[in-house]
Amino acid sequence: MKILVINGPNLNMLGIREPEIYGAQTYDALCSLISKHAVELDISVECYQSNHEGDLVTKIQDAYFSDVDGIVLNPAAYTHTSVALLDALKAVQIPTVEVHISHVDKLEEFRQVSYVRSECVTAIWGHGFNGYLEAMDLLVSLARGISEDVTAPCTEDAVDAADATTAEEGTSCA
């Protein structure tokens, strides 16, 4: 099984940008955590980050031709603006989980709108880096035919993003 983890604009600045919201851990630490979890799950994973909307669209489209079984997508700011990402997800029809490190429901009102969510299996937010691992687990379960109710998005407090990699698992979004 192959999972593609796609991260949008400014996620390369993790640990620098607003650590009180997004935590003190770096993007490299996130990718390392994801890679280690992939080994535990016996799957392959690719982490990709771009600050450019068109590059993100191309990466989603390329996934269709690369035998990708699932996508973990943190579109970052493009969550709230990008019809192009929505259309790319519609085109490829690869199971996708939308992930956000922070509690997007507690940030500015405009950040509470997701253009991509309707094409995702579910959304996980507020679980810090652990949200990525939860998304990977969910996609593996779906691919292996393990039935789960994944229709309800996360709406409750779970963890403090400032301690994103060590916080206890909170409310499940699946």
Feature map (PLM): residue ranges:
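Extreme N-terminal starter segment of soluble prokaryotic enzymes
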Residues: M1-I3
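Short, electropositive alpha-helical surface patch
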Residues: D55-I71
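Short beta->alpha junction loops
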Residues: E46-G54
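Glycine- and acidic-residue-enriched helix-capping/strand-helix junction motifs
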Residues: L14-D28
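Intrinsically disordered, low-complexity terminal tails and inter-domain linkers enriched
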Residues: I146-C173
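Mid-chain, well-packed structural core segment of small domains
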Residues: D67-D105
